[in-house]
């Protein structure tokens, strides 16, 4: 979720190879986007399974659950898979997944954005891909990094065992929960427990006092409902923590790639002390061993959430960059059809993932 302030600085465009390498019309086959649907899961997995990309933006479960809010679309082009979406009326693209000519695909995205009267905005660009982006886009490339949107990635074995001195406090939380609630049990998330999960989600939304925060969590609630309604089609794994017959917590997630699992959602009733720690440990300990890493997503700049995520000793913080390229040369502005008002974008693009 990356807020970016857009402003105009004369001379941003250059004659770098981003503009001149791909002059030949043979490269400019159009991107054929279509709305993301459940039928696209195998297509997305074909590209992400062995890509080694661990950012949560590429979890199909996330992409599908939030698709209505962002009008998410997908297309294949030149060996790449591309996602296009909107936030606050601004067009954006995820960093493409695949193999091929990076300059060609970035130019194709620029052409697509210009056709729709927008500058090119790339999100979810991990550090490993910045050299390709900067080489292709040159001086036209403007980069924004926001610590609030870095993904927390952990070793699965570490979260499952909670061993070592640094995680002693977490083991204490687990032991206290077991002492307070000796009748607790963990069960796999099945259709039987979906109504209780949705009820806990509803109470979580209603507990928010600030109206702006309520709207934000209401959007997440809709995404949760959508994901749980298509649990099997999305290949979700999940679990519920029960005290007696009352639900204390639930969680679910889905693969990002072959070795990384994304925990998409984790909710707990705070009346049950230690429920968050226990649901996390119980769930991760049951994940298949093929998942070396667990992505627990961003902290969004929330102080308490950041402290909690850091306390689990992440293996890495995966920084994600936003990259903006603007049509600033007069001829390009005219070719793209940008008006001065469209070109001088000065408002923020709200959180996308």
Show the residue positions of the predicted features.
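Aromatic (often tryptophan-rich) hydrophobic motifs at membrane interfaces
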Residues: 235-326
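Conserved donor-binding loop and adjoining core beta-sheet/short helix segment
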Residues: 57-129, 133, 242-270
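A conserved beta-strand-loop-helix scaffold within acyl/acetyltransferase catalytic domains
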Residues: 41, 45-71, 184-269
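Active-site/acyl-donor-binding loops of N-acyltransferases
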Residues: 142-161, 295-353
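Hydrophobic alpha-helical signal peptides and transmembrane signal-/tail-anchor segments
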Residues: 1-10
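Acyltransferase donor/substrate-recognition loop-hinge adjacent to the catalytic core
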Residues: 138-215
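Intrinsic-disorder-associated, low-complexity terminal segments enriched in Asp/Asn/His/Tyr and depleted
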Residues: 8, 16-17, 27
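Non-cleavable N-terminal signal-anchor transmembrane helices
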Residues: 20-83, 336-337, 344, 353
């Amino acid at each position: 979720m990356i807020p970016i302030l857009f402003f105009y600085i004369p001379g941003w465009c250059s004659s770098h190879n981003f503009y001149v390498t791909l002059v030949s019309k043979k490269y400019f086959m159009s991107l054929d986007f279509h709305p993301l649907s459940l039928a696209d899961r195998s297509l997305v997995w074909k590209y992400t399974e062995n890509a080694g990309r661990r950012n949560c933006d590429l979890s199909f479960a996330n992409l599908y659950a939030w698709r209505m809010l962002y009008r998410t679309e997908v297309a294949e082009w030149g060996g790449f898979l591309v996602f296009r979406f909107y936030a606050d009326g601004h067009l954006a693209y995820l960093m493409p997944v695949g193999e091929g000519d990076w300059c060609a695909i970035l130019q194709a995205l620029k052409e697509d954005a210009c056709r729709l009267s927008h500058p090119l905005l790339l999100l979810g660009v991990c550090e490993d891909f910045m050299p390709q982006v900067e080489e292709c886009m040159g001086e036209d490339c403007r980069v924004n990094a926001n610590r609030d949107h870095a993904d927390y990635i952990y070793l699965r074995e570490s979260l499952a065992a909670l061993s070592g001195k640094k995680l002693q406090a977490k083991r204490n939380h687990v032991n206290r929960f077991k002492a307070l609630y000796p009748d607790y049990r963990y069960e796999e998330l099945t259709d039987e427990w979906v109504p209780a999960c949705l009820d806990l989600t509803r109470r979580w939304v209603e507990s928010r006092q600030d109206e702006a925060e309520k709207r934000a969590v209401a959007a997440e609630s809709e995404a949760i409902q959508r994901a749980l309604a298509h649990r099997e089609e999305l290949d979700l794994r999940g679990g519920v923590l029960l005290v007696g017959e009352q639900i204390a917590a639930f969680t679910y997630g889905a693969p990002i790639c072959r070795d990384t699992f994304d925990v998409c959602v984790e909710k707990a009733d705070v009346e049950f002390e230690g429920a968050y720690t226990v649901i996390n440990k119980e769930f991760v300990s049951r994940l298949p061993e093929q998942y070396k890493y667990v992505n627990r997503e961003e902290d969004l700049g929330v102080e308490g959430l950041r402290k909690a995520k850091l306390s689990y000793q992440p293996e890495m913080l995966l920084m994600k960059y936003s990259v903006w390229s603007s049509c600033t040369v007069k001829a390009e502005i005219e070719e793209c059809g940008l008006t001065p008002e469209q070109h001088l974008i000065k408002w923020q693009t709200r959180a996308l993932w």
